[in-house]
Amino acid sequence: MIALSVIILASCTSKPEQKNENKTETPNPFLTEYTTPFQVPPFDQIKNEHYLPAFEAGIAEQQTEVEAIVNNKETPTFENTILPFDKSGKILSRVRNVFFNLNECLTNDEMVAIAEQVLPMLSKHSDAIMMNPKLFERIDYVYQHRNEMGLDDQQIRVVEKYHQDFVRSGAGLTKEQQAELSQINEQLSTLSLQFGNNLLKENANYKLVIDKDWNLAGLPQTSIDAAAEQAKNDGMEGKWVFTLSKPSLIPFLQFANNRHLRKQLYEAYYNRGDNNNEYDNKSLIKQMLELRLKKAQLFGYENFADYVLAVNMAQDSKTVDKFLIDIFKPAQELAKKELAEMQEIAYKECENAENEAIEVQGYDWWYYAEKLRKAKYDFDENYIKPYLTVDNVRNGMFMAANKLYGITFTQNTNLPIYYPDVETYEVKEANGDFLGILYLDYYPRESKSGGAWCTSFRESGHDINGKKIYPVISLVMNFTPASGDTPALLTWDETETMWHEFGHSLHAFFSDGLYSRTCGNVPHDYVEMPSQIMENWVAEPEVIRMYAKHYKTGEVMPDSLITKIENSALFNQGLMTTELIAASILDMKYHEITSIDEIKNLDVDAFEKQQMDAIGLIPQILPRYRSTNFAHIFNGGYSAGYYAYTWAEVLDKDAFNYFKSSGDLFNPELAASFRKNCLQECGNDEGMVQYRKFRGQNPDNEPYLKARGLK
């Protein structure tokens, strides 16, 4: 996942910073250019007290910049209107990038309170700019005369995109409609933050505490050790604590023999935000859906989905609906076959143990799927984990990027970091030219949101004088840390996750352009393609041999294990695809509602069940996210956009097949073309136009269908 519009998630578990009334005021680092190496954020100097004044100063600065544009008496041109607007808001960008990123991965009560204060300020500020009639008048003038001003193609695209932004932000509405829209935007920002805060509280508040070691039967030692460490950290030494974070949750569902405890953990995870307590999200969902529909209707759209999709590759909801259901049907048929095979294993186990037969349920799926993988492919995840240390996987992705693009990654331990175990790397071209800085933040902590994402402390671009601005990118994960003498070991899924987020970082490093509006900016249903394509290289035998080495012996992963990884590539794809598409359909159905009254009368749980019943989702499978914990769409910028992961996967599978069919996984000509057309210049034209420049044709969906086991 990439934080395009930074996802505002926060945890309230850390103690707020204690204020000292006698302390000496320190200079606010956000108010001047950073003086650190490579101008990375001076994390060692930043204090909570700096944020609010910096936001206020940033808003004031950009207001002054906009006023200067508006008050210019000269005829509007690209140079006196579009360019200065494109480069405005430096202070605001500086503080926003740091604050909201740290609020996701190193938050505390004081930062949560600041976010609650700042979000309405930012919403009002944005609306004041985007609905400024005099500013829009100047932008509209340039837009209407863009073909007569001698502008180049990129300048014309920048003008067109800004004009589109202003129109979609309410510049063409009446004053009464603008006032309503401003109120809607402010409310949505607050509700979204609250949804995320509730989810973090739900995550943090649940712990499965085990005090009898026989309840650990079946679990790998690494999971047991991690649970013991968690218990120790929670003041329960001698016990074992399992949480709802994926590194704790998934192994328990895969390997724990205690079915009752598997059910407890499974239900706790899927019921987050739906417990009818102070952190319940159902009311927030209804409020957001109503506000989003009102917003869409202000712009003349029948529903919010069509408003969102109008600027995406898919264009409209009907296209997305057909795309999703055409995949869902064969995916669920595959899932039913997987279920039948697992049920057979369950029956045999019960028969051998002379126990009453069980029917496989959702909380059994991962457990019996693991047994099925062992039976069909002789594949045990615990056999490969010793080869997949965090360091090995990281070095492998660096080597792959070097073979593709010639770039290098050199660790620099002298840069400011925001947490002790964060790593920093200088990224350079093959000729030594500087590309940017990469931060790697691997491990969970109480103050950090769950999941994995790529975000930026500074975006690539150029300043108003044409000077290059180098990106500062961060990959944030939640992997199980080292324990005792055992280093941090990754599952195969976590290995793919790291390479996925790394793909986002390559997109960020390579994106280049003179103008902020188009540099690296792509539609939502394109943005996951640069990340997902890297997941294809990670599983190739040639590549596995580059990085998978046993942490004790240094031995390269043997071919027998690599073959098992290859043979099990389609393992559990029925479930994985079905739950993903089901969640995407649920997202669309929420945002295709056309009636305010329907939303007011909505029962969230009943609506979810109704939509899943309508597509025939089998009861053993839930959508990947249930409504009340679907942060992507209610807290993360993917509303009416979760389908984008699948849409982009069709592109990435086709693109990788192009590499593979060339006979060289690291084909230098194809790599150069992919970098230029799909990463570097991706914002220069529409997504499919840029893709065709690389591929020479529209994407073929055959590679996707084969990779998912659907053909």
Regions found by a protein language model. Name each.
Residues 35-50, 99-118, 141-183, 243-283, ...:
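Short His/Asp/Glu-rich catalytic/ion-coordination signatures at enzyme active sites or charged loops
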Residues 20-50, 57, 239-241, 392, ...:
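C-terminal, non-catalytic "cap/extension" segments appended to globular domains
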Residues 1-3:
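Sec-dependent signal peptide recognition
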Residues 480-499:
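Short pre-active-site segment immediately N-terminal to the catalytic Zn-binding motif
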Residues 20-220:
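N-terminal helix-rich structural modules
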Residues 13-15:
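Bacterial signal peptide processing site
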Residues 8-11:
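C-terminal motif of bacterial Sec signal peptides marking the signal peptidase cleavage site
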Residues 154, 158, 190, 197, ...:
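Active-site-proximal, well-structured secondary-structure segments within enzyme catalytic domains
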